[in-house]
């Protein structure tokens, strides 16, 4: 069984609704692909705040999409996980043993809707971007900065790669997120 973008989005919606039933305000936070889900929720709900950490928000390059299609046509169903983009020595990211290509395809397809509606994000937004990210191009954060309709602040992470929550800037990142949320909820 393959999990799709619709499954992830439905699960995020359910979690948001469950939290909204218990909390007065809900902030959404996402790393990488989770950034797409954060945008998806913020585009559809009156979230209190958004935090994006090295988010995937825009359509992938055409050659990447075509390469994925070629692999699927050739019968390749999975690839090795995209993992380990961590600068800090000795830190290992826990991942699935492989990534199903059809699931990645549904994520790629969903990116058009996410990218096209970035301007509908009106919540206060914090964007944390690693200067040296080998997984998600910085154009994703640039697009959010250019199109987000709400107040937005970008903080650069100078000593981390893609998985910044486990990297050298993790404590700084945590402090920035907590300070931002304290200001929003003050």
Predicted segment positions?
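Flexible "cap/lid" loop of the alpha/beta hydrolase fold
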Residues: 47-77
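Short alpha-helix in the alpha/beta-hydrolase fold that links the catalytic acid
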Residues: 123, 137-146
């Amino acid at each position: 069984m393959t999990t799709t973008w619709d499954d992830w989005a439905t699960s995020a919606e359910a979690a948001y609704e469950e939290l909204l039933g218990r909390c007065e305000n809900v902030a959404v936070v996402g790393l990488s692909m989770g950034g797409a889900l954060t945008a998806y929720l913020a585009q559809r709900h009156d979230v209190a705040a958004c935090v994006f950490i090295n988010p995937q928000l825009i359509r992938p390059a055409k050659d990447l999409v075509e390469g994925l299609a070629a692999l699927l046509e050739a019968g390749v169903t999975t690839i090795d996980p995209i993992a380990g983009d961590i600068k800090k020595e000795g830190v290992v990211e826990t991942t699935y043993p492989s990534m199903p290509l059809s699931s990645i395809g549904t994520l790629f397809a969903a990116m058009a809707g996410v990218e096209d509606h970035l301007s509908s994000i009106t919540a206060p937004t914090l964007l944390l971007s690693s200067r040296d990210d080998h997984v998600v191009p910085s154009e994703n954060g640039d697009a959010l900065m250019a199109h987000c309709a709400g107040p937005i602040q970008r903080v650069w992470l100078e000593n981390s790669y893609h998985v910044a929550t486990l990297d050298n800037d993790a404590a700084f990142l945590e402090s920035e997120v907590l300070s931002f949320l304290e200001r929003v909820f003050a």
